[in-house]
Design a protein with these regions (language model features):
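Sec-dependent signal peptide recognition
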Residues: 2-11
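Cyclophilin-like peptidyl-prolyl cis-trans isomerases
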Residues: 9, 16-186
């Protein structure tokens, strides 16, 4: 009897652990392939909650990578002006909008801006993150504890590397940009 109970407890623990972990994994579908992302609710709970809500509501679908700087990062997430499938799409204004939800208070943490890091974009105000985020191509330690890290690419970084780069003379602005096909929980 004790052995059966012990095995059931182990099975329950393993099942629960996998379920908890999976709810914080996302799939970012790009034109070249799927990117698997691990979210970090333990260090950025409000940012993770926002990303998951917007993603699972479909708000990021068809949103362009409006600012992409080679050797640095790819920025996306302007759900107001950057959604290429809606009437309000305006590539010239992409990067200036966000969602209708209130801005988030910063959740700066000790996670580094390494290759594959996902971090929230914001204005000069540290409490202005809303929907925009970026993925680092290379380490960017000068951003550490200045921007909220909320996730990391765990598979498919080679597809992020294929995102069309912007004009280095124009702060990475991209003509005819690549877009997020879909973004959702795994």
């Amino acid at each position: 009897m004790n052995k059966v109970l012990f095995k059931l407890l182990i099975l329950f623990f393993l099942t629960t652990t996998n379920t908890i972990g999976d709810e914080n994994k996302m799939i970012l579908k790009l034109k070249d392939g799927d990117v698997k992302i691990q979210l970090f609710p333990d260090v950025a709970p409000n940012h993770v909650e926002r990303i998951k809500k917007l993603a699972n509501d479909g708000a990021y679908n068809n949103v362009v990578f409006h600012r992409v700087i080679d050797g640095f990062m790819a920025q996306t997430g302007d759900v107001k002006f950057g959604n290429s499938s809606v009437e309000s799409f305006d590539l010239r204004r992409a990067g200036m909008g966000g969602s209708d939800l209130p801005d988030l208070k910063q959740e700066f943490n000790n996670l580094p801006h390494d290759r594959g890091t996902l971090s929230m974009a914001r204005s000069q105000d540290p409490n202005s993150a809303n929907s925009q985020f970026f993925i680092c191509f290379e380490p960017a330690p000068f951003l550490d504890r200045q921007y909220t890290v909320f996730g990391k690419v765990i598979e498919g970084m080679e597809f992020v590397d294929k995102i069309k780069r912007g004009d280095s003379n124009n702060n990475g602005s991209v003509d005819d940009p690549d877009k997020i096909i879909s973004f959702k929980s795994e």
